[in-house]
Amino acid sequence: MRNAILIALLRLPLALMLFILVAPAKAGSFTETDKSVRLIVSGIVSYTRWPALSGQPKLCIYASSHYRQALSSEDEHNPLPYSPVIVHSDRDALTARCDALYFGSESPAKQQEIINQYQDQALLLMSEQNPECVIGSAFCLIIEHNQVRFSVNLDALARSGVRVNPDVLMLARNKKHE
């Protein structure tokens, strides 16, 4: 018994050292594109207002997203303005009672199909695979050559039930907000 406790105590510093060495590597392993996506999504959420929400909004991130790790990882230096939830299906998203959806590889038609299930609910909609931004999401990230920008579907935004600061909408017109 005494030997087991002694061995456990000897392993504790090793485990702590390993944690200290690995934790920063994980946090620092994001690419510049990952960081840009996180920054843009965080900015959009920060400047969005829901009619009946107190506290942080719940952002449901589809598991198909290339940037799900960057969008859901906690970072004490750059806290998220939302509570991230990874969802694997439409049912998961409905059950999670999301305030915002971030689509990954879902087609614009599939996005619209999912959105139609949220009747009369204020919902911020963003996607990374909807370059035309004509149907589906209100905010569409455009990722080209490691640069990230976004466009806005004003019709989808008007129907979303959320209010976004006009300065964010102006950024969509400026091609250099990467």
Model-derived regions, located:
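Short hydrophobic alpha-helices and adjacent helix-cap/hinge residues
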Residues: 2-8, 25-178
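Bacterial N-terminal signal peptides
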Residues: 11-21
